[in-house]
Amino acid sequence: MAKVESFTLDHTAVKAPYVRLITTEHGAKGDVISNYDLRLVQPNTAAIDTAGLHTIEHLLASLLRDRMDGVIDCSPFGCRTGFHLITWGEHSTTEVAKALKSSLEAIANDITWDDVPGVDIKSCGNYKDHSLFSAKEWAKLILSRGISNDPYTRQVV
């Protein structure tokens, strides 16, 4: 089986919340794609409930695109501790952390249910599994801990 970087990461050594560049891939025609670890909660100590995580996912899909160029996708980890962010080009972890922080601030303070995209039967594959209340509570908790641009040394942006 192929070696997967995220399964070689020492999850006991990282200090969430943080942004980590996992890899930058260069295509045959010169295109560049970057993959980031947006770790919101400490691995093996907490996990975001699925309804809250699902709502955060829908909101980050839009909010990160408003704050950064080149966002391709933002998808949750199966362990429910954060997200993969895939982008065109290369962004510093500081730039990504600032965009994430601003997005979580919007979720915590400004977003209403009417702002959450894709929450009906036609636009979501599990539309009943959402919680804006949970998303807001998690956003507040994550922000209170600060988002680092380094996974091992706390460098809060």
From Swiss-Prot:
Sites where the protein binds Fe cation: 54, 58, 124
Keywords, ordered alphabetically: Autoinducer synthesis, Iron, Lyase, Metal-binding, Quorum sensing
Molecular function as annotated in GO: iron ion binding; S-ribosylhomocysteine lyase activity
Signal sequence residues: none
Cofactor(s) the protein needs: Fe cation
Catalytic activity: S-(5-deoxy-D-ribos-5-yl)-L-homocysteine = (S)-4,5-dihydroxypentane-2,3-dione + L-homocysteine
Top-rank EC class of the record's enzyme: lyase
Gene3D superfamilies listed in its UniProt record: S-ribosylhomocysteinase (LuxS)
EC number: 4.4.1.21
Cofactor: how and how many bound: Binds 1 Fe cation per subunit.
GO biological process: one example: quorum sensing
Database matches in InterPro entries: LuxS_sf, Metalloenz_LuxS/M16, S-ribosylhomocysteinase
Function: Involved in the synthesis of autoinducer 2 (AI-2) which is secreted by bacteria and is used to communicate both the cell density and the metabolic potential of the environment. The regulation of gene expression in response to changes in cell density is called quorum sensing. Catalyzes the transformation of S-ribosylhomocysteine (RHC) to homocysteine (HC) and 4,5-dihydroxy-2,3-pentadione (DPD).
Family: Belongs to the LuxS family.
Subunit details: Homodimer.
Record-given protein name: S-ribosylhomocysteine lyase
